[in-house]
């Protein structure tokens, strides 16, 4: 949107910020202005960071930045949503990411997909942190942005689930997909292995 309609994009961003102020966190796949917790990642972050870095800043950058940091941390306090939605809006995957550095596949469904999306979103936060002169957070989120490396099994050249003991998920079939019950979200290792847009080398 920053290319085709930056003014409309600023309206989107102001709506995202308002949603955070009213509900306690950025939305994930909002439906009829309600939290659903559907899908993964915290992709309000790249929308905001993209606009900010391109100079489209008709929004409260400090409030947006604070909300970006909030989106990346595991903290269920202050979120106004139905109890049924909360575990999806604030999945334990964020806790594992921050506490042990990776998301165990035997503790969280779609662990690889969540980790790869979180890594990209965290990279975006690191860029925003630098722009906001928050160098401590910049270093922290740069480190989180490299978390995708945990999942790359060099022996087979695929992103693959790691269990809570740090061992690869077996058996492994890069073409296998069991909707909502495996290490990937609506895809396979063949598709998800390539999702590292912030570090294509």
Residue ranges of predicted features:
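Aromatic-rich carbohydrate-recognition surfaces in CAZymes
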Residues: 1-129, 142, 192-200
């Amino acid at each position: 949107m920053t290319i085709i309609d930056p003014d409309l994009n600023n309206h989107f961003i102001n709506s995202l910020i308002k949603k955070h102020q009213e509900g306690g966190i950025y939305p994930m796949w909002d439906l009829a202005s309600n939290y659903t917790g559907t899908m993964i990642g915290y992709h309000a972050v790249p929308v905001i960071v993209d606009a900010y870095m391109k100079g489209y800043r008709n929004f409260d950058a400090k409030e947006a930045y604070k909300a970006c940091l909030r989106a990346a941390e595991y903290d269920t306090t202050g979120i106004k949503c139905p109890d049924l939605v909360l575990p999806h809006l604030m999945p334990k995957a964020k806790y594992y990411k921050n506490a042990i550095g990776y998301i165990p596949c035997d503790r969280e469904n779609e662990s690889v997909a969540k980790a790869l999306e979180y890594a990209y979103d965290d990279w975006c936060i690191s860029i925003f942190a630098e722009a906001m002169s928050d160098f401590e957070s910049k270093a922290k989120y740069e480190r989180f942005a490299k978390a995708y490396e945990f999942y790359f099994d060099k022996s087979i050249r695929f992103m693959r689930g790691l269990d809570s003991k740090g061992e690869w998920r077996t058996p492994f079939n890069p073409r296998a997909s069991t909707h909502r019950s495996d290490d990937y979200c609506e895809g396979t290792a063949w598709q998800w292995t390539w999702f590292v847009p912030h570090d294509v080398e």
